[in-house]
Amino acid sequence: MNSPAMARRAACALAALSWSLLAAGPAAAQEFPARAVRIVVPYGPGQAPDTLTRALAQELNKATGQPFVVENKVGADGVVAFEYVANQVPADGYTMVVAANTGLATLALTTKGLRFDPVRDLPPVVSLVEGRYAFSIPASLPFKTFNELVAHVRANPGKTNYGSSNSTIHLQSEALMKTLGLNVVYVPYRASNNYLLAIATNEVQMGFTSEGSILNMMPRARVLAVTGTTRSSKFPEAQTFAELGLNDIRSLSYTINVRNGTPKPQFDRLEALVLQAMATPELKAVSGKLGLDPVAHPAAVSAKLLAEEARAFGVIAKQIGLQPE
């Protein structure tokens, strides 16, 4: 038979073990990362998300003493990078991926045969920055306002075209054309640099880009409208879509995400490290130069925003009869 003394000793031992396990959780999290971390970027070198990510990697290296290695995996509208992180790496926090929030939210709506759920399988750790979409035309065209362009397109159905280099811009553009009742020909581009050049050279007559991207095309392009609640400091003459009565045009944000199933201590540690890095003067300066606002929303807020984007774009896709391709 077990004596009361033995029972008490067993209870004490169990309590001590429980406390040691509880203490080990935070300690393990603080020791993470213990080796190099990869940040996968589904954009080419030199593009705004790549530049931002490289600056972020430097700050994370300073904070942890561990290398944060940026790896560009470009292709298939981000699917190459997203599928790699969602399915091919361990859920251990040692691989992250940068994503446009709108890109993840629309991917399942536009792409057939995905082997992962973009919203479920790649939870955001932090929303890094927000930016504007700019609706631009070639500077060689005579239109000075968005409404002047719309009037011209209405008077010439099927004779003008617009472009895009990703599914988000395509979906947003189709929604805009449907709302305004415009008959415009769609021209797809595989690479964003080719698309930007097409706007600058009048190969296409209009299209959405990020604000930072179109800055590189000045003065060969003209911005007629921007997303956001206030006018852009970069293009103050351009009206906001809200001013034009078009309130459903979405803005741009970039998040940093991990594979679903990443242990909570590692997830929380990454969240804290990235939030700390985004608050530094260095990251704020880089963001500003790229025309981006370093909002640094935590994981809970970021997940809610992603779900809202997916819902809103789902409504748009249904309205325009979009089918995955």
Question: Where are these predicted regions, by residue range?
Answer:
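Bacterial N-terminal signal peptides that target proteins for export
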Residues: 2-17
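N-terminal signal peptide c-region/cleavage motif recognized by signal peptidases
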Residues: 20-26
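N-terminal (or domain-start) structured segment
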Residues: 29-120, 157-159, 168-169, 178-208, ...
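An extracytoplasmic/periplasmic, membrane-proximal ligand-sensing/linker region
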Residues: 34-36, 178-184, 264-325
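Structural signal for conserved beta-strand scaffold positions within catalytic alpha/beta enzyme cores
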Residues: 72, 98, 124-127, 164, ...
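Hinge/capping helix and adjacent helix->loop/strand transition within the periplasmic-binding protein
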Residues: 87-94, 109-194, 241, 251-286
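C-terminal lobe and pocket-closing loops
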Residues: 212-279, 308-311
